[in-house]
């Protein structure tokens, strides 16, 4: 059961992400699974200054709001990810400065593994989703499909989505994603990436991946 304490915690985390400059004004949205329901930032809300009146409580299975607050226009992919990924409890759609700049590049990076933090925390493969209208069924379908096996995606000319087990993991993924994109942009394209062997080494010794 969702309590006022849950709502207060959700709002505090929304403000934390805003303070980190992961989104501005009404850009971005956030969701948090609690049992069979989810807290979702409401449509038109400003996540950095989110208030209780703009927090929607939705049934994950049906998507129906339980408290009369309409959820974000992107709630379809939030709920879709939560349905498909029982290991995921938090989903964040954000538009940080450099990562969004990369999403608007004509020639987007095929590889974001500029530092060890990317394969270790963000994902060694980050799918790039074509542009679809925000809030559209096509965008929701593409995001949910991509995030069945990935924890981070780039949305062309739009932004980014990351998911994780809790607020801290999502914060970490979003922050390191932005860091990688800042390196890519500020390098002017003159940057190196980790080799597959170096990534595998990190996965074994940092993430504990078993060797074949």
Give, region by region, the residue ranges found by the protein language model:
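Glycine-rich flexible loops
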Residues: 1-212
């Amino acid at each position: 059961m969702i309590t006022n304490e849950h709502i207060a915690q959700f709002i505090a985390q929304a403000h934390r992400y805003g303070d980190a400059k992961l989104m501005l004004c009404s850009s971005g949205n956030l969701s948090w699974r609690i049992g069979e329901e989810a807290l979702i930032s409401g449509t038109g809300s400003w996540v950095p200054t989110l208030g209780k009146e703009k927090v929607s409580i939705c049934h994950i299975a049906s998507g129906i709001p339980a408290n009369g607050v309409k959820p974000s226009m992107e709630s379809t992919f939030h709920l879709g990810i939560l349905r498909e990924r029982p290991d995921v409890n938090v989903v964040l759609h954000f538009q940080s400065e450099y990562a969004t700049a990369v999403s608007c590049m004509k020639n987007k990076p095929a590889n974001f593994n500029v530092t060890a933090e990317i394969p270790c925390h963000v994902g060694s493969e980050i799918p790039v989703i074509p542009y679809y209208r925000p809030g559209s069924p096509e965008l929701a379908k593409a995001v949910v499909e991509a995030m069945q096996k990935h924890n981070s995606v780039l949305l062309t000319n739009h932004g980014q989505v990351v998911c994780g087990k809790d607020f801290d993991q999502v914060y970490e993924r979003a922050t390191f994603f932005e860091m990688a994109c800042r390196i890519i942009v500020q390098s002017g394209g003159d940057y190196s990436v980790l080799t597959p062997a170096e990534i595998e080494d990190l996965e074994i010794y940092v993430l504990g991946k078993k060797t074949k």
